[in-house]
C-alpha cells in the first residue's frame, strides 16, 4: 500500500516541555527525525516526524531530485522541503530502489503538517532502512535528549 491512508495504529503518547505528539509504535525512526513504515508490498513509506515538522513550520513547497526506479543510498539527498521556519534537504533513510513520491503533496503540501504519519508521507523505497533507525522507545529517548539540548540553549540565550 502506498496511498498513505494506512492507519498508523497503536501509538504512544509523548510529551516533553511544550511538545506533545503520538508516535506510532510499528514505525521505525531515524536520528534525523524521519519515520519509516513497512508496507504490504515490501516497500517502505518515509515521512517526517511531528518533531521535524514542528522545526520546519507550516509547509509551503517541496521537490525531489530522484526519479522513480532510481537507486538510492542512505544519506543521499533525494529532495528538499520548505516550511515557513526553515528549508531542509530530504536525506534518504532507506537504501534501495526509489519507488514513488507522494503525488498528493503536489496539490496539498499541508498534508505533511496535518497528517505527517499518514497521508503526509513523502516518498517510498523498496530496500533496507538505515541500520541506525530505531524503535519508538529509543526514538522517545532521542527526543528527550534533543529537546533538552534546545531548552538548555534557550536558557543560555536568556542569561546573555
Task: Spell out what each predicted region is.
Residues 1-74, 88, 97-160:
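Non-catalytic terminal segments and appended small domains
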Residues 83:
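Flexible, gly/ser-rich surface segments that form the specificity/activation loops bordering the active-site cleft
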Amino acid at each position: 500500500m502506498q496511498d498513505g491512508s494506512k492507519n498508523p495504529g497503536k501509538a504512544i503518547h509523548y510529551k516533553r516541555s511544550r511538545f506533545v505528539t503520538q508516535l506510532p509504535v510499528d514505525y521505525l525512526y531515524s536520528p534525523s527525525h524521519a519515520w519509516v513504515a513497512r508496507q504490504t508490498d515490501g516497500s517502505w513509506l518515509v515521512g517526517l516526524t511531528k518533531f521535524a515538522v514542528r522545526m520546519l513550520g507550516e509547509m509551503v513547497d517541496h521537490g525531489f531530485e530522484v526519479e522513480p526506479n532510481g537507486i538510492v543510498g542512505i544519506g543521499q539527498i533525494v529532495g528538499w522541503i520548505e516550511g515557513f521556519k526553515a528549508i531542509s534537504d530530504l536525506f534518504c533513510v532507506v537504501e534501495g530502489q526509489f519507488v514513488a513520491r507522494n503525488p498528493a503533496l503536489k496539490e496539498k503540501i499541508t498534508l505533511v503538517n496535518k497528517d505527517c504519519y499518514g497521508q503526509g508521507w513523502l516518498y517510498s523505497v523498496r530496500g533496507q532502512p538505515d541500520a541506525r533507525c530505531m524503535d519508538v522507545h529509543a526514538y522517545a529517548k532521542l527526543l528527550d535528549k534533543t529537546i533538552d539540548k534546545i531548552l538548555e540553549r534557550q536558557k543560555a540565550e536568556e542569561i546573555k
